[in-house]
Design a protein with these regions (language model features):
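Bacterial N-terminal signal peptides
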Residues: 8-20
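Short hydrophobic alpha-helices and adjacent helix-cap/hinge residues
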Residues: 3, 11, 24-312
């Protein structure tokens, strides 16, 4: 596990943890709202609950807008002290229907794309720093020189530009293709093996769909190309590897953002924080299928090796 967190928390946070009145903690309630009933959304909750030091209620909207709106109406009548929202649907509902309630979100791709913003909103970014991600690719697949990226024309996430620049700074030749629709996505993915040594999948709801991933996976396996993904789910589905946020760290960071708010900082001016701790996950079956040899000593830098893709 790679830990980038080298500084202690500020004095304001320490003060909040040490001297917050017991009666305030007992009477305060934090709402955790999950977009759906998924393991990925459950994973940060226990650490968040233990860190925040307040009563916590967990709600799931099950991907159903009507269920979400009923929950918003209930919470509007008796607002929680703050919200930890997991997933874009939950974060969007809270930011639009409970705009006065402080919220930290996580597991959200490109919040600005969905209008998840406001004076009481911050979050934990879904992407680790790109130079950290690329360092792991260089370690495990050092022969890669040309890196392919496919993006939709509507993807304006600032992280994309940061990722491309980081790849160039790391010495990669970047072949980036912008596409406008599903047909163009699949055509670009099919052309990639002739142009690159590896494909870097970045968060993009137009590009990364089940059908498109199947196309990419088939082409990459046939050409013996590594696919660097951004989530453990994609590695389980057949990508070679990912460098993804550690869920315990996400829960801790979300709690710390709210504790800073409770200590007197304005949550709306807190930057969306990059993950401090990441997990490197490798798909052994894919590694063998593409003929990639990895020195066994380097596996010490891998947090989990999947023997075979899991059922999703």
């Amino acid at each position: 596990m790679i830990d980038l967190h080298r500084a202690v928390l500020g004095l304001g946070l320490a003060f909040a943890l040490a001297v917050a009145p017991a009666e305030a903690a007992a009477s305060s309630t934090i709402a955790i709202i999950k977009s759906d009933d998924l393991d990925a959304y459950d994973a940060p909750i226990d650490v968040f609950r233990g860190r925040i030091g307040r009563s916590v209620e967990v709600h799931t909207i099950g991907g159903d807008k009507a269920v979400g709106e009923r929950l918003m109406a209930k919470l509007a009548a008796d607002p929680p002290e703050a919200v930890f929202a997991l997933g874009a649907k939950a974060a969007w509902l809270v930011s639009h229907q409970l705009p006065q309630v402080p919220m930290v979100h996580a597991m959200v791709l490109d919040p600005s794309r969905y209008g998840i913003d406001g004076p009481a909103v911050t979050g934990i970014r879904m992407q680790p720093p790109p130079d950290l991600v690329l360092a792991q690719l260089q370690l495990l697949a050092p022969d890669v020189k040309r890196l392919g990226i496919v993006l939709s024309t509507t993807n304006n996430d600032p992280m994309i530009g940061e990722a491309i620049q980081a790849a160039r700074n790391a010495g990669y030749t970047v072949i980036a293709r912008r596409v406008g629709n599903e047909r163009d996505v699949r055509a670009a993915l099919r052309r990639m093996p002739a142009e690159v040594d590896a494909v870097w999948l970045l968060p993009d709801p137009v590009v990364v769909t089940p059908r498109n991933f199947q196309v990419l996976q088939a082409e990459a396996l046939a050409a013996h190309l590594p696919v660097l993904a951004y989530s453990e789910g994609l590695v389980q589905a057949g990508a070679l590897m990912c460098v993804a946020p550690d869920p315990d760290a996400v829960g801790r960071m979300a709690a710390d953002q709210l504790l800073r708010h409770f200590a007197g900082e304005n949550i709306g001016v807190l930057d969306r924080a990059a993950p401090e701790v990441v997990r490197v996950v490798l798909n052994r079956q894919t590694q063998e299928a593409i003929g990639l040899t990895i020195d066994p000593t380097l596996l010490a830098f891998v947090d989990e090796v999947l023997a075979r893709p899991r059922r999703r």
